[in-house]
Amino acid sequence: LVDPSLPPMILEARLNERWGMDLSSVTHVFLTSFDPDRRRTLEGLGHASWYMHEPEIQSAKVAIDDELHRADDDQEVCDILGQHLDLLMKFDVPNDHLLPQVDLFPVPGYTPGSCGLLLLSASKTVLICGDTIATQEHLDKGVVLSNCACAEDAMESFKECIEIADIFVPGRDNVLANPIRS
């Protein structure tokens, strides 16, 4: 399961409706970034193995540590940040070849360590690209999200996605065909 963005009850209903499975059947979870929108279901997936690209784990840890330092006097904020840090430390770093015909595809920019998954087949290349290509509108306009950590890096990653994939699974939309390749 990649970027489990729905609340657990809703995702469980979707999994059951579409594939006849429930959250307990999920064995692996991959996040394209540590963005809170990408991890809403994690509380229902404690039994699964969690993976995230190492640069994303490192950059998220630095960001949380920085916020902890600045929130030194606010115990409530420190407690919340501590929970985020505990959650982050539960992630493992995947191999570059996560599964057969599934490779990591780093797409830094939206966050410093954003990473997609490249699904290789004989006829098409599918890229789960997270928020590097957020929606159909972003793809059509050739733009990235305005809240990127580094817009220049995000745009470079966006261009790499366009060059390599036939089909995109964007971060906030349904599956999209690459207009240059279709």
Regions found by a protein language model. Name each.
Residues V2, T32, M52-H53, I128-D131, ...:
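Active-site flanking residues adjacent to catalytic metal/cofactor-binding acidic residues
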Residues M21, V26-D37, M52-P106, P112-R181:
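Metallo-beta-lactamase
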Residues T27, A48, D166:
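Conserved acidic residues
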Residues S5-P7, H28-V29, L104-V107, V144-A149:
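Short, flexible loop segments at the rims of nucleotide/cofactor-binding pockets, characterized by
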Residues L1-H28:
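Pre-active-site segment of Zn-dependent metallo-hydrolases
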Residues S24, L42-G46:
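Short, conserved loop/helix-junction motifs that constitute active-site signature segments
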